[in-house]
Amino acid sequence: MGTTTMGVKLDDATRERIKSAATRIDRTPHWLIKQAIFSYLEQLENSDTLPELPALLSGAANESDEAPTPAEEPHQPFLDFAEQILPQSVSRAAITAAYRRPETEAVSMLLEQARLPQPVAEQAHKLAYQLADKLRNQKNASGRAGMVQGLLQEFSLSSQEGVALMCLAEALLRIPDKATRDALIRDKISNGNWQSHIGRSPSLFVNAATWGLLFTGKLVSTHNEASLSRSLNRIIGKSGEPLIRKGVDMAMRLMGEQFVTGETIAEALANARKLEEKGFRYSYDMLGEAALTAADAQAYMVSYQQAIHAIGKASNGRGIYEGPGISIKLSALHPRYSRAQYDRVMEELYPRLKSLTLLARQYDIGINIDAEEADRLEISLDLLEKLCFEPELAGWNGIGFVIQAYQKRCPLVIDYLIDLATRSRRRLMIRLVKGAYWDSEIKRAQMDGLEGYPVYTRKVYTDVSYLACAKKLLAVPNLIYPQFATHNAHTLAAIYQLAGQNYYPGQYEFQCLHGMGEPLYEQVTGKVADGKLNRPCRIYAPVGTHETLLAYLVRRLLENGANTSFVNRIADTSLPLDELVADPVTAVEKLAQQEGQTGLPHPKIPLPRDLYGHGRDNSAGLDLANEHRLASLSSALLNSALQKWQALPMLEQPVAAGEMSPVINPAEPKDIVGYVREATPREVEQALESAVNNAPIWFATPPAERAAILHRAAVLMESQMQQLIGILVREAGKTFSNAIAEVREAVDFLHYYAGQVRDDFANETHRPLGPVVCISPWNFPLAIFTGQIAAALAAGNSVLAKPAEQTPLIAAQGIAILLEAGVPPGVVQLLPGRGETVGAQLTGDDRVRGVMFTGSTEVATLLQRNIASRLDAQGRPIPLIAETGGMNAMIVDSSALTEQVVIDVLASAFDSAGQRCSALRVLCLQDEIADHTLKMLRGAMAECRMGNPGRLTTDIGPVIDSEAKVNIERHIQTMRSKGRPVFQAVRENSEDAREWQSGTFVAPTLIELDDFAEL
């Protein structure tokens, strides 16, 4: 007997029959079994008698020699999504569960794990004090490093001038043309208060730089002032701005060189020799951010291969612990490195990772997989696990992985890595860092409305986490080679004491960043006889040109400039050293005494839910990189697909169903999402009467009570998010990310308008209009639909809602939620139907006192004409609030980072299949960057996947209906016939191609124009 993954026991013959049948229809046995179960369940639910089992499973049918032609498969919505949910082991499930757990819970668990025994704590504090004291009292660093350190210390990110310098450093080096560079300099320098920095630093370079920036700032800010003398104008005109440009350019390049070991791997290896002679080791990183195109990924792959060859030869047999190594960024090796593209990552990225690792093994140099954003952690663990069980890598201990102490999951990740090392019979190199993406993790969680942060909101909690994790790593020396990356003297000293005095080569190592940590580790690496600690330090050494430096440089500037950074604080002589090297466990306990609870989050960093303070709640999102959330969503989607969705007119009194029309999924014509019936003229008349009769009752309802009802509706809508997502995906062709955003926006509208009338709103001063007609679009069938209605209801108006013809089902659910929340049935009514019939009857009725419309400019103009001649009882025009389309443009000059431009263009132009009124239509590029930008844009477009939005992998869904598809394709063909270059490309597989033929899909399209007149 065998057991399927669904737990169904089958004899071997039946299993073979299922396998054979599944192969004939190009499906998996697992899919076929689930399909049979779903079909049988549906028959049971719709029948009073027990249906016979399908022949395939009952054994009633025999296989013939010639396979019959399979019948057309019934469409099962969201089955593909369900098949993409990944099984998890106990240890992996624990990691996921800790993703965004409350800080109070996480920190309380960490404290005891991080606490140092009293003798160790005392020794660690003493050593940390000595290290910090020497670091602070040593002579100012000489040469380039000292200049940059002084400049960064003086111009911190808390000042306008510091921000200006960071902006310059981030952008200036990539701008190819002088005019744009001059414009950027004027923008960033002219408003700085540079005088305030004169004389504050003991560094001659910093003071000279300040005087230069002051003079530069005056030159720039007064360049166009009428009071400036002609002679000064001539000086500036002839040499001023070029001189400024050269000076600032030199300063920025100086700053860049501070953090980069060399522009090429050969140069970096040569530059490393000096510190290698002192006992330092190196791990080289080829600079660059995430690949956006296949060409980017291939270029990074070649760069890593060349680097491994060069590093391997330079290692000359020193081995993984004593010799140099390499660090690789997985997002550089694949343009779609994300959970949503899991299968592609495993099929395409993994072979590249394996190839690089085998090459590193050939030279016996360590290869570390760098840590990136939090949502990529778990997919990186899957890649690591697969790598660890490769037969060709058996017995080799050079595989390394980076973990981030600021992540709440970090201790559990270590437990998993220890287990992985045990199962794969190897010793893993684990680099423990504090984390370099803190700002973006906080912002992303806030923007996406997630339940919490993946990282700690207080730096001291990260320090506690680091110690707890360090103890875990040191406890299993046979399984883990710990690599402690820190610039903090107390952390360094604590690890030194915890590891003990019986150090042996290969026990552990420290690590630091090139350009930041060398002064501290000059005291650590070297012989005891020379006053050193005789512990190895490996320098993380970025390699690349100044043009590839940008994002890395910003992270380093943020790290240096943060007022909680040890690197920043050590230079602040007003800060006592005892405070600088305080034990973080003690510091957290003091905080707990002051605040009454352990682990409270930073008071100035509210949870995403509380982002807007007491005014209103932030809407809750859904994390599509969280395996537990995906499993929950999958279950809800399958259940949603079994519901019989209907959109009937929803009046004060119930109506008969009558003859109904199917609502078809635009991505899959075989999928009938539900049924709709258009409101009859008589029902529209009844609704108008009810709206008039109920208007005074709703107006008399206190604003605070109206607000409470809208708040309840928001809570209800949020609780039903998953089933609403299911309708939006099938009825409106929304991708999952779009559908989540749609529900969130609707919830936000309800909270927002409730907040507007809850406090400072009185019936005496804010009188309603009366019955208001709300006509909403299909591109935001829940968000704009809800927003219009919520605004009208909050102000005390009765509402007649006509949804778009294409999306009545989601509108019906929105109205049902409002009614459940307490809006009286006659106050809000749903009238599905066409604009020519239902819409015309509503807007043409004299009892209507206001119209809210979102849609085309053409229809808005018609509405304006129709109601312009009508006046209300007080002789005022009937208000029309119309939101229409436009021709949206993006203007890009050469100061813009090309990668960011491409990301933004893809999101604005092609997200929602380009069907937003705010969607990008015209991209205007500066000549100097046009070719490069277009090349990258085409490559990124080719990586997008267009298909059924019911799959997690889909980036671009269908346009709303066949009429829209025909109109768009006609325009594209017209441009082709005029000789305009047209580019269309998406990633294609056989399943997508079949869908494109039946669904209403239009590939993302780029058309090159010479003139706006061609639009």
Regions of interest found by a model, annotated:
Residues M1-L10, K19, T23:
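Short Lys/Arg-rich basic patches
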Residues T28-P51:
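Short, basic amphipathic alpha-helical segments that act as recognition/interaction helices
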Residues Q43-A67:
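Short, positively charged interaction helices/loops
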Residues E63-N618:
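Positively charged, amphipathic and often flexible ligand-engagement surfaces
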Residues L292, L359-Y363, A374-C388, G395-F401, ...:
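Long, K/E/R/D-enriched contiguous segments that form extended
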Residues G531-L533, V543-G544, T548-A551, R555-E689, ...:
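Terminal low-complexity tails and localization/encapsulation signals of metabolic enzymes
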Residues V729, G755-V902, T953:
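Rossmann-like NAD(P) dinucleotide-binding subdomain of oxidoreductase/dehydrogenase enzymes
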Residues E820-G822, G844-D846, G850, E858-F1012:
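ALDH superfamily catalytic-core signature
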